[in-house]
A protein has these predicted regions:
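Short N-terminal mixed-charge amphipathic segments
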Residues: 1-61
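Short linear sequence motifs
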Residues: 6, 15, 26, 70-72, ...
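Noncatalytic linker/hinge segments flanking ATPase motor cores
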Residues: 53, 61-64, 114-119
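Short coil/turn segments at secondary-structure boundaries
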Residues: 58-66, 96
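Charged, long alpha-helical segments
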Residues: 63-83
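C-terminal charged interaction modules
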Residues: 77, 82-142
Length: 142
């Protein structure tokens, strides 16, 4: 079988104990990332609702573990199955806090957002330039 050489625009970003790989200019990835925030908010609301009814620490820890898994599944949906967020984040629960009290989930999204925004802007800029070039060539050929 022959191998096709194809540049998919995938870039690598050091994250935790591994490498996160994705194409920051992929509009599909950007859309999924933008859809992630409301889903994360819903997971947080669900976590708060469910934890009110729990009476012991073991149940709360189990709920946190399940919610962490759901959010990591969403990250896999956004960035692809080749990016194992449990491994990348050294099995740290995304709802754990850093020294300033921010959740690991918030830190992760804040770190990724400017990379993806720049990628989306680059994609739009290239599309605009290509459209302008097409229009220029059409005008010249008339």
């Amino acid at each position: 079988m022959e191998q096709l050489a194809l540049d998919l625009g995938v870039q690598e970003f050091a994250l935790g104990s591994g490498v996160l790989r994705f194409n920051p200019t992929d509009p599909n990835l950007y859309q999924r990332f933008m859809d992630l925030e409301p889903r994360l908010q819903e997971l947080r609301r669900e976590l708060l609702r469910s934890s009110r009814d729990l009476e012991d620490a073991a149940q709360v820890l189990q709920l946190l573990s399940e919610t962490d898994r759901k959010f990591k599944d969403l990250l896999t949906w956004v960035f692809g199955a080749e990016n194992d967020f449990s491994r990348l984040l050294q099995d740290v629960n995304l709802f754990a806090n850093d020294e300033q009290g921010h959740s690991i989930a918030e830190n992760l999204l804040c770190a990724l957002e400017p990379v993806l925004t720049r990628g989306a802007e680059q994609f739009v800029r290239r599309c605009t330039q290509a459209a302008q070039e097409k229009a220029r060539l059409r005008r010249e050929n008339q």
